[in-house]
């Protein structure tokens, strides 16, 4: 995981809270590049310590070969390709994106542009694929997605790129920080939000409630996310291994605020 990222930090706080409540201590290991040997080496080091279980908050596109565990080691993973192999807890990415895009279409926008998260993030890839699929199912044009990462600076650059196009009236950003950067760029370029352009984020960070205008977003329950993963590990520690297909999907919630409105006629 990368603790400086807001989502991972909030999920980690949930892990710490749940583990502490169960009278467990937590060792944190930050892995810069999960798809490289960094994750394998981190797991190797941890597995040779006296640990009772492993929670992988974020592993991106890491393959199963990167997570080599001792037999019967309790483990829980999240939002990565590893969810196909190990017990997992993840936000309802698909439902959240459908809510966001559907909200913009219901307001009357002809289509919805998208600013992506990073290519090495499974969550980002799911959000992009679901955005495109939702538009196709509604019979709408699927615009070229704008590449980005999780940072506000990338959203700002995307906003500068999209602002000159008067056909851009609605944008779904892969996270709130991208959305906040994009809104600033739109304002600087004379595009009013939401009068000229509606913007929706994803995550439900507290700062979005105090942006101008307040950000419409899809809220994830990061604390519950951390709690569920700890519960999966504790269940395995008490009762033995769980089926790798065991998956907990945590609902998301669309928070409609001031950054979305019907398109100006």
Segments from the language model and where they lie:
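Glycine-rich phosphate/diphosphate-binding loops that line cofactor/substrate pockets in enzymes
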Residues: 101-112
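Conserved hydrophobic residues forming the short capping helix/wall of the S-adenosyl-L-methionine
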Residues: 19, 134-135, 186, 237
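Hinge/beta->alpha junction and helix N-cap segments in small-molecule ligand-binding domains
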Residues: 1-10, 28-37, 60, 89-99, ...
């Amino acid at each position: 995981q990368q603790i400086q990222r807001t989502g991972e930090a909030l999920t980690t706080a949930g892990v710490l809270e749940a583990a502490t409540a169960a009278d467990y201590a937590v060792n944190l290991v930050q892995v810069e590049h999960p798809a490289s040997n960094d994750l394998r080496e981190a797991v190797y080091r941890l597995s040779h310590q006296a640990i009772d279980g492993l929670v992988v908050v974020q592993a991106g596109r890491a393959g199963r070969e990167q997570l080599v565990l001792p037999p019967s080691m309790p483990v829980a993973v999240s939002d990565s390709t590893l969810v196909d192999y190990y017990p997992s807890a993840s936000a309802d990415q698909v439902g959240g994106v459908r809510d966001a895009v559907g909200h913009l279409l219901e307001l009357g926008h002809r289509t919805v542009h998208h600013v992506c998260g990073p290519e090495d993030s499974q969550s980002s890839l799911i959000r992009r694929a679901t955005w495109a699929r939702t538009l196709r199912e509604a019979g709408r044009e699927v615009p070229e997605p704008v590449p980005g990462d999780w940072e506000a600076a990338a959203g700002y650059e995307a906003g500068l790129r999209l602002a000159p196009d008067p056909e851009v009236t609605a944008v779904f950003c892969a996270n709130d920080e991208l959305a906040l950067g994009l809104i600033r760029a739109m304002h600087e370029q004379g595009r009013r939000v939401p009068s000229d352009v509606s913007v929706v984020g994803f995550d439900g960070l507290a700062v979005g409630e105090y942006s101008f205008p307040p950000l419409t977003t899809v809220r994830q329950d990061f604390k519950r996310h951390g709690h569920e993963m700890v519960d999966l590990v504790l269940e395995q520690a008490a009762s033995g291994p769980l089926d790798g297909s065991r998956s907990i999907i945590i609902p998301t919630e669309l928070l409609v605020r001031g950054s979305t409105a019907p398109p100006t006629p």
